[in-house]
């Protein structure tokens, strides 16, 4: 399904929160939407492997990496795992790497930057916690919609049809 965040903001202005324009699209899917699972981890993506091994149909992994752009939390292997398990997308308040490979995958991926240095894989972090960045507070179960224009968040699913 294709999402137009500008149109959704026009229709649901009172029901959505707009994330500050910090993010760029790195995935092969220009728009995506779904229910979020929140993760908080800093320069360590071990927990992301565990979560992306789960069925992701209709879900988006929302990663609070503390805004660090020193180490990439998402790489091509993690993105392929997400795609294999039918995740709709990944939003990272942090960095990604292997950008050329990410662009080839039919997966929504938004992050604040790219860097070639990979993250540690110790599994340090927590999931299903409240996270806050970009002027918005996110909870697991909220609904996120993203495209090349921006990212919006709604407590309940929006009627897109």
Curated annotation (Swiss-Prot):
Belongs to the RraA family. CDD domains: RraA_family. One of its GO terms (cellular component) is cytosol. One of its GO terms (biological process) is negative regulation of RNA catabolic process. The keyword Ligase does not apply. Its main location: cytoplasm. Keywords: Cytoplasm. Gene3D superfamilies: Ribonuclease E inhibitor RraA/RraA-like. This is Regulator of ribonuclease activity A. Pfam families: RraA-like. It is found in: Cytoplasm. InterPro entries: RraA, RraA/RraA-like, RraA/RraA-like_sf, RraA_gpbac. Homotrimer. Binds to both RNA-binding sites in the C-terminal region of Rne and to RhlB. Globally modulates RNA abundance by binding to RNase E (Rne) and regulating its endonucleolytic activity. Can modulate Rne action in a substrate-dependent manner by altering the composition of the degradosome. Modulates RNA-binding and helicase activities of the degradosome. The keyword Transport does not apply. One of its GO terms (molecular function) is endoribonuclease inhibitor activity.
